[in-house]
Amino acid sequence: LLRLTTIRRFQEAHSLSNAARTAVVAWLMTAVYYFYQYTMRSAPAVMMPQLSDAFGLTTMAVASMVGLFYYGYSPFSLVAGVAMDRLGPRKVVPLGAATMGVGALMFATGDNQVASFGRFLQGAGGVFALVGAAYIAMTHFPASRAATLIGATQMFGMAGGSAGQFVVGPIIASGVSWNTFWAGMGIVGLAISALLFVLLPPPKPKPAEADGAWLKTAGRTMLLVFRNPQSILCGMIAGLLFIPTTIFDMIWGVRYLQEARGFDYATAVIRSSTVPFGWIIGCPLLGFVSDRVGRRKPVIAAGAVVLLLCLAWILYGPTDVLPPYVVGLVAGIASGAAMLPYTVIKEANPPEASGTATGVVNFLNFTFSALLGPVFGWILVSVSGGAARMSLEHYQTAFEPLLYGVGLALLLTLFLKETGPAVRRPAPLAAHEGL
């Protein structure tokens, strides 16, 4: 009997080991997909003149075309969240990567309408990367590691964002044509899709539902998440902390540094890429700190304060006082706090709504980028009178509202309910009340 028990325990341990290994591989591959998605998201910033010439559009019109990414990304966040809860990652994440690959190939055609729809598809397919990685992290790993793993996921994403500027910039400058780059990225996307299909584990079997019942269940789950005020707060805080990167740095950063600060192209690309590089450090670091102290709100608030100071310095401070690249790097590190609402919304909603919760916060987050991107561009054109080259004052006037947005995020954090492990652990006395 003892021998049988020992064998059974060994088999259970071996099974758990295999399951853990499968989960790690699945999360890692989905994080690589997120790296790829962010590379494609940020790459247009370093080739705006080439895109403007190729499409025969003004820089502002190209910025609007590039912004179509968020018009696909934001609404499909809800689709991705529901699909993840319903079907599991293996059935939907590879499809998202394939959609991104096709979108890149369409963008490479150089036809305005085809490229615009291709950019939209890149956003629609790209949303499955973060939602899939976060779903795997929350359902296959201990809750005490949630913020760390989601932060690590965003680390991969921002590594791609940094590569989209720091690596792609020199590639384009070396003479590689913009459409060759996009065609190559399309092929990479299709390859990632195939790997995801092979490496992601099959979904766990679920009880059969009557025809149409799953749609009602999905609707109830989404309504449950949207009705939770904490969900709305999470989306607003994340969105307000994200837009300094998604709108200012990733679309206008290089041009701002060239026109307003007088840097050459190569230096502007490197300086701009320090922000997403800072995210690489900040996302896992702040996630780890939050898990370590067992609280979310203080870390979000601290990150918002530091980001506010850095953003004010980037817009109004001199460029020759602090060491090069420091302010952008610190701004990126502080921006990592924007990922903590992704953990909070999951902790503030039922476990069975995990995927939907991620979809909702992603939808609210990037709705800010989708709606406000053209607004900031319009303000910049208005204050400059449509000038071909903008001045420092033009950029300061156009992007000063970003400071108010980060300040609002800090204020909203005060109303956020603390959901960290420290408040979810039973108090020592309460744990012994029944003794």
Walk through the language-model features, giving the residues of each.
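Helix-to-loop junctions at the C-terminal end of transmembrane segments
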Residues: 76-88, 282-295
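Conserved MFS/SLC helix-loop-helix module at the cytosolic interface between two early adjacent transmembrane helices
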Residues: 75-113
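Helix-loop-helix hairpin linking two adjacent transmembrane segments in secondary transporters
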Residues: 112, 153-202
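Extracytoplasmic
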Residues: 25-59, 248-254, 372-376
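Extracytoplasmic gate region of multi-pass secondary transporters
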Residues: 44-46, 229-286, 369-377
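Cytoplasmic helix-loop-helix junction between adjacent transmembrane helices
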Residues: 118-157
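Cytoplasmic membrane-interface "Motif A"-like loop-to-helix N-cap segments
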Residues: 86-97, 291-305
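Juxtamembrane intracellular "pre-TM" segments in multi-pass secondary transporters
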Residues: 9-19, 203-235, 429-435
